Amino acid sequence: MVNQMLDLVKPELETGPDFIGKTFFEPAAGDGNFLIAILRRKLAALENRLPAETWPIESLFALASVYGVELLPDNHAAAQAALLGEFVDFHKRHGNPCGRRTNLFQAANFIVRSNIIQGDTLTGLDATGKPIVFSWWNRVPGESSTVQREDFSLTSLQNTAEGTLSFDFFPAYAPTRIDHVHKEA
């Protein structure tokens, strides 16, 4: 069933231009099955379409395009662990160093923790009662491995869809290599 659903968005997920950066949001992530299937497809497409030397950086951009919210703490932890595990397994299969001390692992872990949030999509609040905040990971034009991080709230997306303005203010981040985003924290 998951694969049939993903087949409906194959151009955005695997074959279209800029497929790596096309974002996907799961409002009820559960233990991450849908998110893992999305990442798995993106990584397979990356493997088929891009040179191997670009995989570490491009896989981080693929991971950064997957977002989710989960209400239950155990499911939230399972979703984060499974998504990170899928990422690490991809790199282990291809001989790319991705141990806990590598920048690749630490950046991936930071992205997963920033993009998969424990909270309630209906209220727009995280587990602590604060607004759910995500980060856009915008690729800097002309600098293939550099990202500009920009925070946004879930409610700002809902407000934009309703035609109202958001007055949320978030910190500004300097452009950085995507494999060094964990150093900003």
Where are these regions (language model features)?
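SAM-dependent methyltransferase catalytic region
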Residues: 1-185
